[in-house]
């Protein structure tokens, strides 16, 4: 799980505004992390709030990575989006960028571009079964998953014991008591 936070442990303002809390160096390092993982996992809420594409952007990779690997070898990770309420639509930036997308949902809907696959998951306590999602990813040999999501999905993954590593980028800023926290835990 990758998180960016302020000194007071907040990931966003109370309004939800969260872009560019961390430094350009941290953002370059995130590109490196994306490039080395099989998949990037996020939520519909994060995709809608940030307009995220979750791709590896060559121009933003650290110089050391660019020097070691030719641009033509760049591989886009599978982007896995948890969308339990079928809120996402094909016109979002995520679906306009290169690379495969897997939508984890309770029900399949609509017509999607060829590179978008919908995966139905069972509900467990009214939420998508995240353990089933990770088991299905493992069956497809997707074993390294970078999570870039908000406090709800990150907290659920921690609660289910599905987190092996936390990467925290801390910015020299204060967002205040009303800001959003790192995790929603029961």
Task: Name every feature range the model reports, one short phrase each.
Residues 1-3, 166:
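A structural signal for short, well-ordered beta-strand segments
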Residues 3-7, 11-144, 152-155:
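Active-site ligand-binding patch in enzyme domains
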Residues 151-152, 172:
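Conserved beta-strand edge residues that scaffold enzyme active sites
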Residues 160-186:
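Flexible, gly/pro- and Lys/Arg-enriched active-site loops
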């Amino acid at each position: 799980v990758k998180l960016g936070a302020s000194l007071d442990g907040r990931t966003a303002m109370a309004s939800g505004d969260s872009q560019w809390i961390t430094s350009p160096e941290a953002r370059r390092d995130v590109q490196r992390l994306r490039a080395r993982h099989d998949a990037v996992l996020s939520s519909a809420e994060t995709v809608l709030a940030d307009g995220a594409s979750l791709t590896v952007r060559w121009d933003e990779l650290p110089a050391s990575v660019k020097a070691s690997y030719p641009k033509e070898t760049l591989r886009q990770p599978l982007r896995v989006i948890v969308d339990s309420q079928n809120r996402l639509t094909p016109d979002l930036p995520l679906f306009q960028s290169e690379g495969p997308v897997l939508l984890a949902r309770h029900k399949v809907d609509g017509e999607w571009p060829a590179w978008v696959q919908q995966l139905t998951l069972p509900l467990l306590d009214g939420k998508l079964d995240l353990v089933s999602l990770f088991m299905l990813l493992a069956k497809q040999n997707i074993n390294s998953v970078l999570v870039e999501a908000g406090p709800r999905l990150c907290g659920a993954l921690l609660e289910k014991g599905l987190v092996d590593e936390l990467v925290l980028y801390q910015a020299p800023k204060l967002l205040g008591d009303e800001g959003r926290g790192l995790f929603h835990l029961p």
